[in-house]
Amino acid sequence: MAQARRPLMLIILDGWGYREVEEGNAVLSAGTPNLDRLVKDYPWCLLEASGGAVGLPEGMMGNSEDGHLNIGAGRIVYQNLTRINISIRNGDFFKNPVFLNAISKVKANDSSLHLIGLVSCGGVHSYTPHLHALIKLAKEKGLKKVYIHAFLDGRDVPPKTALGDIKKLNEFCKEHGGAKIATVSGRYYAMDRDKRWDRTKLAYDVLTLGASQYKAPNAETAVSEAYGRGETDEFVKPTVITDHEEKPVATIRDKDSVIFFNFRADRARQLTWAFVKDDFDGFVREKRPKIYFVCMARYDEDLDLPVAFPHEELKNVLGEVLSKQGLTQLRIAETEKYAHVTFFLNGGEEKRYEGEDRCLIPSPKIATYDLKPEMSAYKITDEVVRRIQSGKYDVIVLNFANMDMVGHTGIFEAAVKAVEAVDKCIGRIVEALKEIGGVALITADHGNAEQMIDSKTGEPHTAHTSNPVRCIYFGNGEVKALKKGKLCDLAPTLLELIGIPKPQEMTGKSLLVKE
């Protein structure tokens, strides 16, 4: 068995981007004595965490899913966004048998096609050109009853982007076959991932029953009125669009086909479960239509659903390599990022490797995380210090969600507090490692909190950034420096630190400079 330092830690500070401009920079504005000391006393480098470096289109901001996939894979992983874009360009998208089957069922049943998902150019969960391609495909195949159920972003893009996006979408629909927007819902409701079923139910009910607190004659009015209520895009209450008789334009009914065009799994699962699971118990479904439900990508490997772009298996990811060497590993995070240190870090696979323990700390049950910027970081730290001291683990992977999740709120003061809370936790963890000769790489998956104000508009900036991220080596003096690199270089670096040869599938390179 390879000789392991006990333990070697990978600490991922979600949303901890690197930016030298101080204005709107919660990272630089915060008091961070522990991180400052580490930067001063230990080797560090910058890593690319966006665009082509993580398998996304050039210039596109990074995100947590893609970041953790690249970290765990040790190679650039070409993301669903890129794969789908290529299929549209080469025409394969319009021949996709899963889409064609959904359309053929609509024709056979004289029913409706419903396109549900996030209307956003953010490229994190969805991408508007993919919706455009589906609308074009429906027109090409002669469908007359095509309805869009628009989830609004305001998180991966500025908080009041939806009105302009909806206007453009309506114009596109008029030019390409007349698809109609039937409902709008903020992603806070339609894309919850923390089992806050009361939110998911509101989205489900507007889709299946046309039942909602608000209604509007068109989607633009729905968004405008939501702004008037003080709601930004993410928080727009589910709203049904009605016809001249004030009846819903469309609801999802028996024999309809539904295409969920989000390509990222974590925030698509709950609503999908509500539609398709026989044993669903999140809430009482007043109506459960019998439909043909298509997922753009694989949302849940336990569900036998048609998937337009199936998962591409990654072999010899970090967790698998460690397990093959007989090493013990721990993955620890709070709810908001638990999937990232497990599912995504393991190459998009649900399976747990032999020797892999997992620790989930519940995220606080509050409306928005600016109300509790520390989130569950202190509880995570209590637990991980105990696990470090146990001597059980060779490798520990930890994620602190604070800088990303609080950064998404756009509340600068809260983001500063989030950074400071994480810094306190880093101080405790480093001390625990020092006592037993442990080693750590401290890094991030993408930026966020370093840019809380939009430099062009002066408005709050709630999205991720395309800035690089730091990687700090904490340990003994054998590592003299770190080379600039990409997120995919982290796994090879960890393997070198622990004395394991890099598998041929890992094309990333070690960051270590030892001479």
Curated annotation (Swiss-Prot):
Signal peptide: none annotated. The active site is at S64 (phosphoserine intermediate). Mn(2+) 1 binds at D404, H408, H464. Keywords: Glycolysis, Isomerase, Manganese, Metal-binding. InterPro entries: Alkaline_phosphatase_core_sf, BPG-indep_PGM_N, Metalloenzyme, PGAM_B_sf, Pgm_bpd_ind. One of its GO terms (biological process) is carbohydrate metabolic process. Pathway: Carbohydrate degradation; glycolysis; pyruvate from D-glyceraldehyde 3-phosphate: step 3/5. Transmembrane segments: none annotated. Binds 2 manganese ions per subunit. Mn(2+) 2 binds at D14, S64, D445, H446. Substrate binds at H125, R155, D156, R187, R193, R264, A265, D266, R267, K337. It catalyses: (2R)-2-phosphoglycerate = (2R)-3-phosphoglycerate. GO terms for cellular component: cytoplasm. Its cofactor is Mn(2+). Its EC number is 5.4.2.12. One of its GO terms (molecular function) is manganese ion binding. HAMAP family: GpmI. Belongs to the BPG-independent phosphoglycerate mutase family. Catalyzes the interconversion of 2-phosphoglycerate and 3-phosphoglycerate. This is 2,3-bisphosphoglycerate-independent phosphoglycerate mutase 1. It comes from Methanosarcina acetivorans (strain ATCC 35395 / DSM 2834 / JCM 12185 / C2A). The lineage of its organism: Archaea, Methanobacteriati, Methanobacteriota, Stenosarchaea group, Methanomicrobia.
